[in-house]
């Protein structure tokens, strides 16, 4: 039995979290998106594992189904991939009432969603996330994007799906490293909005072992994370204010991701970003003194990094491409305690120093 979460955005939809949901994709898509044709967009890792049950379910529900596959990895979240999928969709003569189905992790969802947002100025879109990170974060909220040479997620659109189908059984095929990477967003949600969840994770970390022992409990944790994001997104769908809280750890984290040439997972980079900002906040007396240690320990128990060997100058240089930059300032999420964060417009020179302090390096605003 699936857990259902209502997302009451301008175009409302539901998220289903449970097991054996891939086989129910057809009826769920039919009931929410309609149309007669469906293109499944997937990658070379996920497609061989899960495309057939989804395709068969869609066909059983009356869809004419085509599959578009691209190379897996953040390196392929590029304009070339985006255009290739657009051409595929056009060649298969999808109309605006037909549906694009994203089957995969965050990269697949981001690219397929951007295609759906822009093909014929918008067609139906369904998210079927198969990674933990995509289930708890990127599949919900309507953000779609591709990367540019200058930085991550610099071209994109807000485009809400018709439905999100999160089959927790898909997580069993993740490596421990992939599963741990998704926990970066889980820890982030707990820090910004849910002290009780943070304490529960301290007692019992979210791991593949827990998935094998108690899949229902993992489904509940995933649903809880989705509900945290739901509350923020519904209050601020277009990220004009409070939705920026979801960017905790992301300004520095995205910069680390770029410095590492996207070879380090997004969740790990976010946890490094959280560590950087929290340690710097503690040095300035902005947050509870014990906060850095608690976050670092929880991240470590989930197999996540909270620091790196990069120079502050290198991280700062990449952070200058961040979408949250406004002239000589940037909007940073500053933690004060578990469940207590604020959005602060911070001078870039101060941001450079915070990065340096968070990395244990001497602040030097001359790089600004």
Regions found by a protein language model. Give the residues of each.
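ATP/NTP phosphate-donor binding region
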Residues: 1-99
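Solvent-exposed alpha-helices and their adjacent loops that cap or buttress functional pockets
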Residues: 32, 93-95, 118-120, 147-148, ...
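Generic secondary-structure signature for well-ordered alpha-helical cores
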Residues: 91, 160-163, 169-176, 184-196, ...
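Short glycine/serine/threonine-rich phosphate/pyrophosphate-binding segments
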Residues: 107-114, 135-136, 255
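A glycine/threonine-rich phosphate-anchoring loop and its flanking beta-alpha core
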Residues: 114-207
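C-terminal charged capping/lid subdomain of soluble metabolic enzymes
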Residues: 184-187, 286-368
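Active-site segments that bind and position negatively charged phosphate/pyrophosphate groups
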Residues: 204-314
